[in-house]
C-alpha cells in the first residue's frame, strides 16, 4: 500500500483547509477543551495546552503513520489564520475504506463550514487516494453531525 498523501493546503469558496501545526495548538485547544465539542466527537475535553501540543506532535502523527492516514486539515475561514475546526480521516477500515471525522468551534456552528470542508476532503480522497468507500460514524444524540452526514449524501447503515 502506498503512503496516503494529500496536498498540505486546499481552498474552498469560503475556507482554507491546511495541515495543522504546533503554532495552531492554542486555537485548537480553545474548542477541543469544550465538552460540547469533544464528547460528541468521541474524546474527553483536552485539559491543557500542553496536552494539545502533545497530541499534535505525537499522537496524531503516530496514528496517521500506523494506519496510513493522510494528515487531515485544520479548518480556517478565508481572511483569517485561525483554526476553528478540523476534518480528518481518523480510521482506516480497509485499504480502500476510510472513516471521516470533524470538529468545529461552537461559535461557527450553523454556517455550513463542516459540510463544505468535509465535501472537499471526500472529493479529493476519492480522486487522489482511489478509495472505494468513506464511512462516517456519529452518536445517536448528535443531531448536528447527522445533518452533516445527510447533507454529504451518506446512507444510514445502522441505528
Positions of predicted regions on the chain:
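Hydrophobic residues in alpha-helical segments
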Residues: 32, 41, 63-65
Amino acid at each position: 500500500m502506498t503512503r496516503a498523501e494529500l496536498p498540505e493546503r486546499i481552498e474552498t469558496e469560503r475556507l482554507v483547509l491546511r495541515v495543522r501545526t504546533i503554532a495552531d495548538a492554542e486555537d485548537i485547544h480553545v474548542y477541543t477543551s469544550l465538552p460540547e465539542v469533544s464528547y460528541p466527537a468521541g474524546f474527553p475535553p483536552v485539559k491543557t495546552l500542553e496536552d494539545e501540543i502533545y497530541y499534535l506532535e505525537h499522537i496524531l502523527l503516530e496514528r496517521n503513520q500506523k494506519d496510513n492516514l493522510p494528515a487531515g486539515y485544520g479548518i480556517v475561514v478565508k481572511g483569517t489564520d485561525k483554526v476553528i475546526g478540523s476534518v480528518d480521516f481518523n480510521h482506516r477500515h480497509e485499504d480502500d475504506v476510510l472513516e471521516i471525522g470533524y470538529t468545529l468551534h461552537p461559535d461557527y456552528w450553523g454556517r455550513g463550514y463542516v459540510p463544505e470542508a468535509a465535501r472537499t476532503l471526500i472529493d479529493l480522497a476519492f480522486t487522489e487516494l482511489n478509495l472505494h468507500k468513506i464511512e462516517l460514524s456519529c452518536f445517536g444524540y448528535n443531531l448536528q453531525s447527522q445533518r452533516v452526514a445527510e447533507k454529504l449524501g451518506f446512507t444510514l447503515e445502522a441505528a
